[in-house]
Every structure is written in C-alpha cells, then in structure tokens.
Amino acid sequence: MKTLKINFLLVLIILISGCSSVPKNTADGCSIFNERYMWYKHAKKAEKKWGTPVYLQLAIIKMESSFDWLAKPPRQKLFKVVPYKRPSSSFGYSQAVKGTWKQYKEETGNKLAVRTRFKDSVDFIGWYTNKTEKILKVSKKDAFKQYIAYHEGWGNYKNYKNNKKVINLAKRVEKQSNIYKQQLSLSLIHI
C-alpha cells in the first residue's frame, strides 16, 4: 500500500512538472505553439473574444513572466542581504496583481480563473488590452502603448514619458511583438 502511494505521488509530480515547464524556445512563437498546441487554441480564443493579437499576448507574457507559470517579482532585500517582502502581488504568466485579477474575474464572470493557468492568463490580457483600448483609446495593435498601460495601469499611463525604464521595457515588448508577428505569419499554424 505504501509503495502504491509513493508511485502515485511520483506519477503526479511528473505529470504536473511536465505540464507546467517553460517552453524550450520562448523567442519563437511557432516553437512555443508546436510544443504547446493547446496554448495556441487558448490564445486564438482570446484573440477572437477580445481582438487582442496573439503576437501581443505572447510578447506581454514573455516580458512579464518569461512563460514561467509560477513567476513572482523578486523579493526586496533588507540591508542588501535579508530577503523581505515582494514589491507587488504580481503572479503567474500574466503577472496580474490581485486587485486587477479580482476585477477581471468579477467583470467577466470567470470566477474559477487562476493566474497560473495559461488559458486564463491570455484571456486576462485580452480583457485588459480591450479595456485599455476603450479607456485610453490605444489600439490593440500598438504593442508599445498597450504594454505601458499594462505595466503602469490605466491611471498612471499618462505619466509614462517621465519613466525611461518603462519606455525601454515597452520598446522591448514592441520589438518582441513584431518578431512573434513575423514568425507566426510564416508558421505552418497560420495565425
């Protein structure tokens, strides 16, 4: 009986770790979807529902979490040594903070959504970019400004020109978005 329990736990651990590992080549959209076909289905569903291009969804996730389902911001340090609290409640693929995630769940009725599930994360990104387009009049095809709104929030968006760090991050997202767009247009998947 004890052996059966141990074997069950080993199989469970292998299954969980196999399903949640980071794709081998996150720089290539085609490679990501060839490795994770269901991710393609989920991203396309979010694109159809919200109008957010798949390549923008991927670029935001790459910047926010590097496709790590358990990603969290690094802990702050006390006296540059002692681990302390995290700077925000960001978590999962989308790095959504608790308050915004709660708002997403309430507004969409997706009460069972979790930040560690790719399906829910791309739907969240679609919802967020859709609201950004409505609130700030930023096109979903404008990766640069969409990412600034995503990173800074709708209220702080207007102040981004004074924040060189955010501008540089947004430029990287824009560049990665264009790379994914080109890759996916040439891919056998045909997005």
Where would I find each of the regions flagged by the language model?
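Hydrophobic membrane-insertion alpha-helices, especially the h-region
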Residues: 11-14
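Bacterial N-terminal signal peptides that target proteins for export
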Residues: 1-8
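C-terminal motif of bacterial Sec signal peptides marking the signal peptidase cleavage site
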Residues: 17-18
